[in-house]
Curated annotation (Swiss-Prot):
Organism the protein comes from: Pseudoalteromonas atlantica (strain T6c / ATCC BAA-1087)
Subcellular location: Cell inner membrane
Gene3D superfamilies for the chain: 2.40.30.20, ATP synthase alpha/beta chain, C-terminal domain, P-loop containing nucleotide triphosphate hydrolases
Listed name of the protein: ATP synthase subunit alpha 2
Catalysed reaction equations from the record: ATP + H2O + 4 H(+)(in) = ADP + phosphate + 5 H(+)(out)
Keyword terms, alphabetized: ATP synthesis, ATP-binding, Cell inner membrane, Cell membrane, CF(1), Hydrogen ion transport, Ion transport, Membrane, Nucleotide-binding, Translocase, Transport
A GO MF label: ADP binding
Gene expressing this chain: atpA2
Function: Produces ATP from ADP in the presence of a proton gradient across the membrane. The alpha chain is a regulatory subunit.
Lineage: Bacteria, Pseudomonadati, Pseudomonadota, Gammaproteobacteria, Alteromonadales
Pfam families in alphabetical order: ATP-synt_ab, ATP-synt_ab_C, ATP-synt_ab_N
Binding sites annotated in the UniProt record for ATP: 169-176
Gene Ontology cellular component annotations, sorted alphabetically: plasma membrane; proton-transporting ATP synthase complex
Keyword Repeat part of the UniProt annotation: no
Length: 513
C-alpha cells in the first residue's frame, strides 16, 4: 500500500494534535556526606519520613532524619562507591515488599527478592512494610489454640491464635529449636508460617531451611533472611517485611504464625543506625524510641474479626476471622531479664516462655522454667482435653521444686511428702521432649492422662520416656479411632476417659517398654 504525501501530512498532524506533554516534577538533592551506610543529603525538600530516595546505580536509601536543611538517610545495600556531590531524587513512595502465596516455600531477603536460587517469585502484589495495626474495634478475643507440639508449652503456657508470646533466654538454651518445632507442627493445621532471621550466620539460616525442608514444613513457610553480613538497615527492616508478608494471610481470613529470631539483634541494628544519625542515646545507648520500634511491630500481630476481613476483601471472604500469631525471640545476657530490651518486650507481649541455662544443662529440654513462664491468654486458648488433663502439671512442678529444696536438709520425710516428690520427678521427666518431634493433641493427651491418673507411679524414672514412646505407638495402632476423635474434636468426656483408662491398663499389662 502506497501512501501519498497528503495522507502522510495528515497522519503527522493527527499525531501532533494528540501529543501530550507529561511533566513530572521531582525533588533533587545532593549528597554532602557518606558515613558507614548513612548519607546526608542537601536540597531535598518535601520528603516523607521513611520515603525511598533514588540513588545512582539503581539503589535506594530510606529517609529517617528530616532536619532543617538536610536529610539523613540509610542506604539499602552497598554504599562504598557513593560519593559526595552525587545527585539523588525523591521517589514519593514508601518501601514496599511483594506478598502472596507465591512466597511460600521460598527464602527471600528483606526486600522480598529471592535468594534461594529457585527463580523469580510470582507475587500477588506489593504492600508497604510499615502499616498501622488493627484498632480495638477490628479485633476479636483470642480463643483458638495454636499447638506448638511441646507438652510443657501446650499444657502450662498455651499460645492462642493472634497472641504475642515471647520466647526469652540466654544463648544456646533452645529458643530457635522451640520456634522451629512450632512451625513444623503447623504442617497439617493450615496455618501459614513466616520465619524472620535477623543478624544470624548465613550457615545457621541455611541449616534451619534444611530442617524445615526435611520435615515437610517449607511448603507452608516463608523465610525472610537478613544475615549478620547484611547492612544494619536491612537487619532493622527485616521483621517489618516479614510481618507484611504474614498480614497478607491474616487480612484474608486465614491464620498465620510469625517468628522473629531475634529482636535483640534488630534493636542492636537500630541502635547502630540511630547513633550514626547522631540521635541522642538513652539507656544502654539505645535511642529513645526503641520501645516504639518493637511495639509498632508486635501490635500488628492480632486476631481480626469477620467485619474486618469482609471489608478488607470487599465481600469476597465472609464469616471468617483472621489471625497473625507472633513468637518474638529475645536473647538475655546471663539470665538478666531486667535489661532494657527484654523488659520492653515483656511489657508489650501477652506472656513469655522463659528458657533457663541450668535446666538445659541438666538435661531438661525444652528448658522451660514453669515458675516465671506465663501466658496471659491462658486456658481460653487451650484444647479442652489438654486443659482438663494438664491443669495439675504446673502445680505439681511448683510443689516439687519447693519440696526438693526442702528435702535436701530433711533426713526423714513423711509418706505424703515423698509421694509428692516422686510425682513431681515423674512430671519433670515426662516434660522432656526431643527436638523436631512435636506431638499431636491426642499423643500429648495420652501422656498427660498417664501421669495425672498415676499410671507412671511404678515406672522407673529412667524408663518414663521409653514408656511414653511405646504407649504412643500402641495407642496409634490399637486405638486409632480414639486418637482420630481426640485430634479432630479436642473434647474430653466420661466415655473418652473410660477408654483411655482401659487402654492404659491393657498397655501396662503388655510390659513392652
Amino acid at each position: 500500500m502506497q501512501l501519498n504525501s497528503t495522507e502522510i501530512a495528515e497522519l503527522i498532524k493527527q499525531r501532533i494534535e494528540q501529543f501530550e506533554v507529561v511533566s513530572e516534577a521531582r525533588n533533587e538533592g545532593t549528597i554532602v556526606g557518606v558515613t558507614d551506610g548513612i548519607i546526608r543529603i542537601h536540597g531535598l525538600a518535601d520528603v516523607m519520613q521513611g520515603e525511598m530516595i533514588e540513588l545512582p546505580g539503581n539503589r535506594y536509601a530510606i529517609a529517617l532524619n528530616l532536619e532543617r536543611d538536610s536529610v539523613g538517610a540509610v542506604v539499602m545495600g552497598p554504599y562504598a562507591d557513593l560519593q559526595e556531590g552525587a545527585k539523588v531524587t525523591s521517589s514519593g513512595r514508601i518501601l514496599e515488599v511483594p506478598v502472596g502465596r507465591g512466597l511460600l516455600g521460598r527464602v527471600v531477603n528483606t526486600l522480598g527478592a529471592p535468594i534461594d536460587g529457585k527463580g523469580a517469585i510470582e507475587a500477588d502484589g506489593f504492600e508497604p512494610v510499615e502499616k498501622i495495626a488493627p484498632g480495638v474495634i477490628e479485633r476479636q478475643s483470642v480463643d483458638q489454640p495454636i499447638q506448638t507440639g511441646y507438652k510443657s508449652v501446650d499444657a502450662m503456657i498455651p499460645v492462642g491464635r493472634g497472641q504475642r508470646e515471647l520466647v526469652i533466654g540466654d544463648r544456646q538454651t533452645g529458643k530457635t529449636a522451640l520456634a522451629i518445632d512450632a512451625i513444623i507442627n503447623q504442617k497439617d493445621s493450615g496455618v501459614k508460617c513466616v520465619y524472620v532471621a535477623v543478624g544470624q550466620k548465613a550457615s545457621t539460616i541455611a541449616n534451619v531451611v534444611r530442617k524445615l525442608e526435611e520435615h515437610g514444613a517449607m511448603a507452608h513457610t516463608i523465610v525472610v533472611a537478613a544475615s549478620a553480613s547484611e547492612s544494619a538497615a536491612l537487619q532493622y527492616l527485616a521483621p517489618y517485611s516479614g510481618c507484611t508478608m504474614g498480614e497478607y494471610f491474616r487480612d484474608r481470613g486465614e491464620d498465620a504464625l510469625i517468628v522473629y529470631d531475634d529482636l535483640s539483634k534488630q534493636a542492636v541494628a537500630y541502635r547502630q543506625i540511630s547513633l550514626l544519625l547522631r540521635r541522642p542515646p538513652g539507656r544502654e545507648a539505645y535511642p529513645g524510641d526503641v520501645f516504639y520500634l518493637h511495639s509498632r511491630l508486635l501490635e500488628r500481630a492480632a486476631r481480626v474479626n469477620e467485619n474486618y476481613v469482609e471489608n478488607f476483601t470487599k465481600g469476597e471472604v465472609k464469616g471468617k476471622t483472621g489471625s497473625l500469631t507472633a513468637l518474638p525471640i529475645i536473647e538475655t545476657q546471663a539470665g538478666d531479664v531486667s535489661a532494657f530490651v527484654p523488659t520492653n518486650v515483656i511489657s508489650i507481649t501477652d506472656g513469655q516462655i522463659f528458657l533457663e541455662t541450668d535446666l538445659f544443662n541438666s538435661g531438661i529440654r525444652p528448658a522451660v522454667n514453669a515458675g516465671i513462664s506465663v501466658s496471659r491468654v491462658g486456658g481460653a486458648a487451650q484444647t479442652k482435653i489438654v486443659k482438663k488433663l494438664g491443669g495439675g502439671i504446673r502445680l505439681a512442678l511448683a510443689q516439687y521444686r519447693e519440696l526438693a529444696a526442702f528435702s535436701q536438709f530433711a533426713s526423714d520425710l513423711d509418706e505424703a511428702t515423698r509421694a509428692q516428690l516422686e510425682h513431681g520427678e515423674r512430671v519433670m521427666e515426662l516434660m522432656k521432649q526431643n527436638q523436631y518431634a512435636p506431638l499431636s493433641v491426642a499423643d500429648m493427651s495420652v501422656s498427660l492422662f498417664a501421669v495425672e491418673k498415676g499410671y507412671l507411679k511404678d515406672v522407673e524414672l529412667d524408663k518414663i520416656l521409653d514408656f511414653e514412646a511405646a504407649l504412643h505407638s500402641y495407642m496409634n495402632s490399637e486405638y486409632a479411632e480414639l486418637i482420630k476423635t481426640i485430634n479432630d474434636t479436642g473434647n474430653f468426656n466420661g466415655e473418652i476417659e473410660a477408654t483411655l483408662a482401659e487402654a492404659l491398663e491393657k498397655f501396662k499389662a503388655t510390659q513392652t517398654w
